Swiss-Prot record:
Binding site for UDP-N-acetyl-alpha-D-glucosamine: 10-12, 124, 196, 300
NCBIfam families attached to this UniProt entry: murG
Protein name per UniProt: UDP-N-acetylglucosamine--N-acetylmuramyl-(pentapeptide) pyrophosphoryl-undecaprenol N-acetylglucosamine transferase
Highest rank taxon of the organism: Bacteria
Keyword Membrane: yes
Catalytic activity: di-trans,octa-cis-undecaprenyl diphospho-N-acetyl-alpha-D-muramoyl-L-alanyl-D-glutamyl-meso-2,6-diaminopimeloyl-D-alanyl-D-alanine + UDP-N-acetyl-alpha-D-glucosamine = di-trans,octa-cis-undecaprenyl diphospho-[N-acetyl-alpha-D-glucosaminyl-(1->4)]-N-acetyl-alpha-D-muramoyl-L-alanyl-D-glutamyl-meso-2,6-diaminopimeloyl-D-alanyl-D-alanine + UDP + H(+)
Family membership noted in the UniProt record: Belongs to the glycosyltransferase 28 family. MurG subfamily.
Organism: Natranaerobius thermophilus (strain ATCC BAA-1301 / DSM 18059 / JW/NM-WN-LF)
EC number: 2.4.1.227
Matching Pfam families: Glyco_tran_28_C, Glyco_transf_28
Pathway: Cell wall biogenesis; peptidoglycan biosynthesis
């Protein structure tokens, strides 16, 4: 079985692809994988480090405004299309799957023109411009949220599978996480995630409320500040938080295994990226979501809205974020066992614990 996988730019496209690759290897004794990305995206480092064959093509993002960049886009698209044709001809895949990002455009188009079966996966409720276009040609379009079907009305065939990243969470054993993170079993755990680089507004708010949270509530806090803010936050926190409470505050610039922390948390405060939501629902962890306003199509707000409407999350907006509202939201959830239970049940109802398996079944059916 030979599978060509493409998707890149950000972890939100790469990690779902890796989840599918891992499941394919579990299901098939012999599977040959080629991952096609770009030399500028995160995939050019992540994929080879996983021992997966990698090839890069030329691609450029499409500008929505009419300008000279669109000429360059067309030039690079045609170049990428030719490069994709050569790669596909040499590799001869049985099926091609794309998980989003501009690199999917020329790769899936070339595969489609060469009559090779193609599958597309969309992680967000609102599809990216590339995936929306490609859904017209892909044999199957797999979506993480059923609501995505409203935005991909011209898709040939669309099916809700969930995000394959979720299956990697449900299949793991997290029994030793509490000990590894040095957490107490007699306290509720609040996980605050500001992103890999950090989010200024979230961090500014958290710095001011953590001393009150940790002194008033029987909780322990894991706070992932982001690399850009760690040193300044650490110095301020040590100044504001009483020494007697500091053992209940775990500060990290970055956590390499964030799903492990999510799995042992009682409540998570985070952005609303697609991968994060897949991890939250897979771990059945309630959340307070603060969508980033700086993303294309405002997709984090729409993602968060789905969880909020189904009772799995409380949604706050960054532009109206204030300290007392955050404290009130945390208290109303983490100090109420009934609310926690209801939110946990809601996350379970919208999780897709076998997403990677379902996608692999589709890939296998096309061969």
């Amino acid at each position: 079985m030979k599978v060509l996988v493409t998707g890149g730019g950000t972890g939100g496209h790469i990690y779902p692809a890796l989840a599918v690759i891992n499941e394919l290897k579990e299901r098939n004794q012999i599977v040959d994988i080629l991952y096609v990305g770009t030399s500028k995206g995160m995939e050019q480092e992540i994929i080879p480090n996983r021992g997966i064959d990698f090839a890069a093509i030329t691609v450029r993002g499409l500008q929505r405004k009419i300008n000279l960049e669109q000429v360059y886009f067309l030039r690079d698209f045609l170049k990428g299309l030719y490069q994709s044709y050569r790669l596909i001809k040499n590799f001869t895949p049985d099926v091609v799957i794309g998980t989003g990002g501009y690199v999917c455009g020329p790769v899936l188009m070339a595969a489609s023109l060469m009559k090779i079966p193609t599958v597309l996966h969309e992680q967000n409720v609102i599809p990216g411009i590339t995936n929306k276009f490609l859904s017209r040609f892909a044999d199957y379009t797999c979506v993480s949220f059923p609501e995505s079907k409203n935005y991909m009305t011209k898709a040939k065939k669309i099916i809700t599978t969930g995000n394959p990243r979720a299956q990697e969470i449900t299949s793991r054993d997290f029994s030793s996480v509490n000990k590894h993170l040095n957490l107490r079993s007699d306290l509720k755990t609040l996980l605050i995630v500001s992103g890999s680089r950090g989010a200024q507004k979230i961090n500014e708010t958290m710095i001011n409320i953590i001393p009150e949270l940790i002194s008033k509530f029987p909780i322990q806090i894991i706070y992932v500040t982001g690399n850009n803010y760690y040193e300044s936050i650490r110095s301020q926190i040590l100044e504001y938080v009483d020494n007697s409470y500091q053992d209940r505050l775990k500060l990290h610039a970055y956590l390499s295994d964030l799903p492990a922390a999510i799995s042992c948390a009682d409540l998570v405060i985070s952005r609303a990226g697609a991968t994060t939501l897949a991890e939250l629902t897979a771990a059945e962890t309630p959340s307070i979501l603060i969508p980033s306003p700086n993303v294309t199509n405002d997709h984090q707000r729409v993602n968060a809205k789905i969880l909020g409407e189904r009772g799995a999350a409380k949604v706050l907006t960054e532009d109206s974020l204030n300290e007392q509202e955050v404290i009130k939201s945390i208290s109303s959830i983490i100090n109420d066992e009934e609310v926690l239970f209801d939110m946990q049940r809601a996350t379970k109802e919208i999780s897709y614990p076998t997403a990677a398996t379902e996608i692999c079944k589709i890939l296998e059916s096309l061969i």
